[in-house]
């Protein structure tokens, strides 16, 4: 569920009309993903969405554990050593990805004004700088204001 309406996106990017609505929706998704990745937390529109995601964690963890055990058992019965090694590596990668996703939900956050403002800043920046090459400017990965707004809520401090 998007954290901003299309009307809010249009106002943020100073767009009159609906001609860029599809692009704005895509860029909003990118801005939300970027904020969540920077925070290393899942971002939810309200407490009920966070609570629902938390309620699903135990069943998801059990299913992931069963899938991992099944993959390891299949690898153990594989006669080709290289194939078995690859099967174990894939199982580990899947397990780690699911653990990361579960951890992000476990430490999820309900959006607040700072997170929404950061998402708006990133949306505006993505819309204004849609091209890969900018003339006369230096490209940055995230607007400085967005980082400042998100930093207090970030789980893992780093660059």
Can you say where each PLM-predicted feature lies in the sequence?
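Divalent metal-cofactor coordination and adjacent catalytic microenvironments
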Residues: 1-159
């Amino acid at each position: 569920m998007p954290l901003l309406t299309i009307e809010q996106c249009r106002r943020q990017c100073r767009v009159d009309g609906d001609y860029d609505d599809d692009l704005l929706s895509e860029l909003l998704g990118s801005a939300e993903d970027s904020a969540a990745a920077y925070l290393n937390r899942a971002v939810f529109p309200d407490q009920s969405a966070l609570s629902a995601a938390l309620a699903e964690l135990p069943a998801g963890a059990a299913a992931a554990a069963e899938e991992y055990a099944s993959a390891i058992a299949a690898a153990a019965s594989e006669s080709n050593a290289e194939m078995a090694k690859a099967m174990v590596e894939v199982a580990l990668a899947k397990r780690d990805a699911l653990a990361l996703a579960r951890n992000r939900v476990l430490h999820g956050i309900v959006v607040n004004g700072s997170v929404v403002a950061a998402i708006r800043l990133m949306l505006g920046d993505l819309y204004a700088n849609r091209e890969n090459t900018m003339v006369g400017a230096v490209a940055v990965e995230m607007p400085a204001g967005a980082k400042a707004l998100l930093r207090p809520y970030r789980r893992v401090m780093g660059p």
